[in-house]
Amino acid sequence: MTRTPGFNTLAVHAGAKPDPATGARATPIYQTTSFVFDDADHAASLFGLKAFGNIYTRIMNPTQAVLEERVAALEGGTAALAVASGHAAQVIVFHNLMQPGDNFIAANKLYGGSINQFGHAFKNYGWEVRWADVNDLSTFENQIDDRTKAIFIESLANPGGVFVDIEKIGDIARKHGLPLIVDNTLASPYLVRPIEHGADIVVHSLTKFIGGHGNSIGGVIVDGGTFDWSKSGKYPMMSEPRPEYGGLVLHETFGNFAFAIAARVLGLRDLGPAISPFNAFLILTGLETLPLRMQRHCDNAASVAGWLSNHPKVAWVNYPGLPSDKNNALQKKYSPQGAGAVFTFGLKGGYEAGVKFVEALELFSHLANVGDTKSLVIHPASTTHRQLSDEQKVKAGAGPDTVRLSIGIEDVNDIVADLEQALSKV
């Protein structure tokens, strides 16, 4: 094509060509551990990073490569690395950036699993997280010191459905020479493209809207190609000679996709959380319909949120697409085509009412996931955010009365009918 493909076209075609061996139009599942070298020189070139190619599926696989190229195209990045899960993506990102004794700033509005990973598991690596309030951006800047290595936010926070001001936080990051990492899982690139708003690195749980069907686990790291890893000397993984590769300096050699290369040949190679080719295939298949699904998700969610906001047993609805929502202006700025499909609301009966309501639902599936074609529900305080203190739960938007919904693509009248019958039993 001579013209630049649109988003819908990229979702179907980016990274994929008919299989050269068989002519198969669907991307094949390359279910193999390793790949045959042409000769000794070819093998040496691959291992020395002098040529691109496949060595071992722990590091790279052709099915995985199509997925990576497609997500990078949709996000507007220079390169991507697919891994086993969203959590694995976060570990590898920070492995690229951090040394023992370093810290990073993270928004207080995050998925409960990320709060736990950052606050507990990362301590074992000597990495400190410093929590900042997305409603008071001075708390991001005030905690930065000479050992701070990054700022981490979610574009659309889980579980509260809160849009975060990426551009203003990006300004703070650039002022202090720090990369901005944005988890774009709940928005997906269909709604928000964080790199266009100042992000340097984007991560996803591919398990959610990108895969979209609740059948596969995966994660991805997208390199925005926007950060100078050599300027400050704070990021030796990219800026200093690597003894494993004969003194190669990744940023000098690979330029605006050096972060993605480091994530693959240092992080994924040594830590090992590889995505399976079959999961990569399933996620690719789901990704083709992302624009269609995401718009239906958003349209249904807007209808459901509006209906809930007028129900007498509902205390509050936290959905940025509602004109009355305090986050509505940010939603219109960053995601005018929709406010996402994951949001929370509170029941007047508190914790007990929330549990009873969840158990009364019939169409909704009660499980710990979001971004499925099917409508999903969970009571965060008793499940996903259970490990947090009461104060942390409230700050994360997971108070005792909170119910999280992930609205699917079913007939919206059926979704509302199920909510109505469950509310009648509370």
Task: Identify the function of each model-found stretch.
Residues 119-120, 128-130, 146, 166, ...:
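PLP-dependent enzyme catalytic core of the Aspartate aminotransferase-like
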Residues 2-3, 11-13, 17-20, 79-310:
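Conserved PLP-enzyme active-site core in the AAT-like
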Residues 52, 78, 279, 283, ...:
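Short amphipathic alpha-helical segments
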Residues 222, 344-346, 406-408:
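Short hydrophobic/aromatic beta-strand micro-patches
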Residues 76, 147, 313-316, 363, ...:
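Glycine-centered tight turns that cap/initiate beta-strands
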Residues 2-61, 69-70:
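N-terminal "arm"/small-domain region of PLP-dependent enzymes with the aminotransferase-like
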Residues 271-274, 278-280, 289, 294-296, ...:
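Conserved small-domain helix->loop->beta segment predominantly found in fold-type I
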Residues 39-91, 113-121:
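Conserved N-terminal alpha-helix of the aminotransferase class I/II PLP-enzyme fold
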